[in-house]
Amino acid sequence: MKIIADENMPNAKVLFSHLGDVELVNGRTLTHEQVREADVLLVRSVTKVTKELLEGSSVRFVGSATIGVDHIDLDYLSKANIGFSSAPGCNAEAVADYVFSALSHLYLTKKINWLSKKIGVIGYGNVGKTVYTRFANMGCQVHVYDPIREKEGGSANFVSLDEILSCDVISLHAPLTHTGSYPTKGMIGRKELAKLSAGVTIISAGRGGVIDESALFDRHKQLNGNLHLVLDVWDGEPAINQKLIAIVDIATPHIAGYSKQGREKGTWMVYQALCQYLALDANVISKHDAISAGWLSFVNVSAEEPQEEMLARSMHAIYDVSRDDIRLRFKYRENKEKNVFDWLRKHYVERDEFNTCIIGVSSSDASNLMSAAGFSVDNK
């Protein structure tokens, strides 16, 4: 069996080699000729899996090590009787870590005390729910907008989009959709951005295109720069809006979900799905062996510290988002070509998830807060 896999899928050869011959390829530039004789195609979000790519090939199964599927023509796969699986939720913890690392950065650089602010989350899928739950468990006043999930029921504090736009912190985790009752393409446009007050923080870590970037730039200017922006996703990736880079607080190349464990989980989930599709034993390689432990095992914190200080120090010990911002700005100063975006993703410096680290705390309040933030806790 011939397996074509994106070169940026960690452990792809380790996991899939016992199933067949694995060839690693550049997912962005993948062609029909490369997949023509393949039986299995394993991709990430940079590969558009279409009829044009697959028609006339021998591909019988497509796996995407991602939570989103907007890059997959699901209708064609169904009509062509091609099996498919993605990895929903694989990087939810990683994206939540990104959000809180960014908020910690804003606290340390601008003294934004986000714990006491009104929080709005857009999108209540696997990632949005994880982010929402962390905020809620930390005692924050948190709301969520997702009309589709709201109709399905649930205990989250669902509100209107206008209510979200009145929040102090807005974290976007919606998929990119162009059709249906609630398309998200350009959902946060000029009209919506005009409702934002000065001092609002926007974190965009879902899909590029949900925010109208031109309107965002203009609103930032109208508010005299008093709009705090953290952008991980961009409209037109891998091209990136240079004007926006210049004004945002944090700019990163679609790596919010790029924790070592999150990416490994994505590969692992697709491996499990392929084994099930082939009616093979999926436990030849254990999950324990497939997903790494963290490198930093223990951090001590003092309950005497302000809560935001304690959180920021712990979070940045594991993952400081500003390092990714600095790398992006440096590489774009060197070379403004669009391949910089993919180069940064391919050569990403690995990071661990908060849950791989044990936090040593001396009080029950601090223990509860750090546990709610996603850490493992050791009560001293």
UniProtKB/Swiss-Prot annotation:
SUPFAM superfamilies referenced in this protein's UniProt entry, alphabetically: Formate/glycerate dehydrogenase catalytic domain-like, NAD(P)-binding Rossmann-fold domains
Localization of this protein: Cytoplasm
Residues holding substrate: 45, 66, 258
CDD domains, alphabetized: ErythrP_dh
Binding annotation for NAD(+): 146, 232, 257
Keyword vocabulary terms for this entry: Cytoplasm, NAD, Oxidoreductase, Pyridoxine biosynthesis
Pathway in which the depicted protein is active: Cofactor biosynthesis; pyridoxine 5'-phosphate biosynthesis; pyridoxine 5'-phosphate from D-erythrose 4-phosphate: step 2/5
Any single Gene Ontology cellular-component annotation: cytosol
Active-site residue list: 207, 237, 254 (proton donor)
Disulfide topology: none
Source domain of life: Bacteria
GO molecular function per UniProt: 4-phosphoerythronate dehydrogenase activity; NAD binding; protein dimerization activity
InterPro entries in the record: D-isomer_2_OHA_DH_cat_dom, D-isomer_DH_CS1, D-isomer_DH_NAD-bd, Erythronate-4-P_DHase, Erythronate-4-P_DHase_dimer, NAD(P)-bd_dom_sf, PdxB_dimer_sf
Catalytic activity from the UniProt record: 4-phospho-D-erythronate + NAD(+) = (R)-3-hydroxy-2-oxo-4-phosphooxybutanoate + NADH + H(+)
Gene Ontology biological process: 'de novo' pyridoxal 5'-phosphate biosynthetic process; pyridoxine biosynthetic process
E.C. no: 1.1.1.290
Family according to the record: Belongs to the D-isomer specific 2-hydroxyacid dehydrogenase family. PdxB subfamily.
Protein role: Catalyzes the oxidation of erythronate-4-phosphate to 3-hydroxy-2-oxo-4-phosphonooxybutanoate.
Subunit structure: Homodimer.
UniProt-recorded name of the protein: Erythronate-4-phosphate dehydrogenase
Native species: Marinomonas sp. (strain MWYL1)
Encoding gene (name): pdxB
